Design a protein with these regions (language model features):
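N-terminal export/targeting signals for secretion/compartment entry
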Residues: 1-81
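Intrinsically disordered, low-complexity prosegments and terminal tails associated
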Residues: 38, 49-327
Length: 327
């Protein structure tokens, strides 16, 4: 049992720094299963500190002018119709054909929040570019980049927050990694369950419901499981189609027209507001004409001390193409 009060001010910052560094190094490595945490599962000051640090994917505070909130409020009535249409279009779409001497290049760009001190944070852009070889025996390649912050928070104290960054930059891990089967972090990049997941929408709904755990609600857990798999850029068209139909059936699913991903592409946002997170709205963004998955967005629900309701606090863009070489 912990009886000592939590550290504050300078003492907190000193205790927080090594935890932040460790989690920053691990978070990108584990992005393929970003299970949402709740404070109900936290039982110590240390765990609360770790939790606050893990939420670097834009769940707490922050926004960026380069990812504007565009479009109408989510409308639940049309979500199922939009997703069914996207599923139909996806079935008509062929997966990229990668020759034996070529690579499937999948680029994931994101702006995510890194906490600098107990009070200050920064919105830090980074990217993960994966090269999957057409030759099954060849190594995969992962290229990681991290850039300087595009914003500091709170905005009213941006200069002080920037000084905290300058004192100890909290960028994401960078560099190039090569590994067989894309096992850059001990497990393959492509989720192992993709091959065995049912393609029948009813069977897939049951599968997702049985395997979804660890979020603020079961509905959120189901949404996160599907979103994480889609975010790898490795889900084949037939499974994407079934996943869209499953999303359409998750209670609370809504559609936001004219959503925007990080690289400026426009699509339809499909997601839900989580009541246990003050209405925070997380969504996948799809191209309604092709059924392609093009990114994700997270928007604030209730207004906070620094952010109005409906602010985009996290945005990703996922794109893929076939290339002739890897770095």
């Amino acid at each position: 049992v912990i009886t000592a009060p939590p550290p504050e001010g300078v003492e907190f910052d000193a205790a927080f720094a090594p935890v932040r560094r460790a989690v920053l190094a691990e978070t990108v490595d584990r992005r393929r299963r970003r299970t949402r945490w709740t404070f109900g599962a936290v039982g110590s000051v240390a765990a609360v500190t770790a939790l606050a640090t893990v939420l670097v994917a834009g769940n707490v505070t922050g926004a960026t002018d380069s990812v504007p909130l565009v479009g109408t409020e989510p409308q639940a009535a049309s979500a199922a119709e939009v997703l069914r249409h996207a599923a139909d279009e996806t079935v008509r779409t062929s997966d990229p054909v990668v020759g034996p001497d070529q690579f499937l290049e999948v680029r994931i760009a994101e702006q995510s929040q890194a906490f600098l001190t107990q009070r200050y944070s920064a919105l830090v852009p980074y990217s993960l570019t994966v090269y999957r070889p057409g030759d099954p025996g060849a190594d995969w390649t992962l290229v990681r980049t991290s850039e300087d912050p595009v914003a500091f928070f709170p905005a009213s104290e941006a200069a002080a927050a920037e000084a905290a960054w300058d004192a100890e930059p909290a960028g994401w891990p960078t560099g190039t990694i090569r590994a067989a089967d894309g096992a850059f972090y001990d497990t393959p990049w492509t989720p192992a369950e993709l091959a065995s997941m049912p393609r029948d929408p009813d069977a897939l709904y049951r599968w997702v419901s049985e395997h979804a755990t660890g979020s603020a609600s079961h509905e959120e857990a189901m949404t996160v499981l599907i979103t994480d798999d889609l975010s790898t850029g490795m889900v084949p068209a037939d499974l994407r189609s079934a996943m869209y139909r499953v999303l359409a059936r998750i209670p609370g699913t809504a559609v936001t027209h004219d959503a925007v991903t990080l690289d400026g592409r426009r699509g339809i946002g499909i997601g839900r507001a989580e009541p246990n997170r003050d209405g925070e709205h997380s969504e996948v963004v799809i191209d309604p004409d092709t059924g392609d998955f093009i990114g994700t967005r997270t928007l604030t629900g209730a207004a906070t001390g620094t952010l109005p309701a409906g602010t985009v606090i996290d945005s990703t863009a996922v794109s893929s193409t076939v290339v002739d070489s890897a770095p």
